[in-house]
Amino acid sequence: MRIVVPMKAVPDLVEEIELTADETDIDREYLKFVLNEWDAQALEEALLVKDASGAEVVAVGLADDPDIDQALYTAIAKGADAAVKISATAASSSTRTSDRAALLAGYLAAEPADLVITGVQAADDLDGQLPPMLAAHLGLPHVSVVVAVAAEGDGVTVRQEFAGGRSHELHVRTPAVVGVQAARQAPRYAPITRIRQAMQAGGLQTAEATPAGAAPGLTVRRMYRPEAAGQAEMLTGDVDEVAARIVDLLRDRGLVKG
């Protein structure tokens, strides 16, 4: 079984985020990028399938993604058999989900996989559209919000999670696309020495792909910081003064009596 795991680099949320002048995107020039946390879960689940069945795991990323090399080398250090950096043969955007799905579909049309395991969503979109869009391009069955995958017979058995702690199991014939919410265990740690070994070995492959027919997708009209709906009053003084002021405020609002 050949498993392909698409990976995406997203802005590190510990960084200060600034907007572009036209307020349609974040300013990416000086940001640090890290692997999307849901893709890290997807990679771990793929590696668990490999551990159990001997499957081949190939991590792929788009060449336009900042810092994607680090994520791909880390995937090799964790146990992926190969890592591929994909470039588009035509103009394509790596920030729009529809364009990412089209380019990944173009690669997979040339390099088919028995199973595509990707994160259910990304930290910079939270729309969950990549797995179903990719499956639609490829004409494959798709299951998302998955928390376990196991190779079985002519396909895979997956556990899909619902609200309220409910879940159910499905058997899906391969080839198929699976969107992982969480792996069965926390993503494994890759020692720095192993990542450096992967870098020194020059293990990244490159590939060109022609995007499949992309849907128009979404257009961001405006990004802006949350608008303040009220104000906070800072209380100063010693403990007794602050306590008395709090009681007065609660009385003024009718929340306490006396």
PLM region spans:
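N-terminal glycine-rich FAD/FM-binding segment characteristic of electron-transfer flavoproteins
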Residues: 1-258
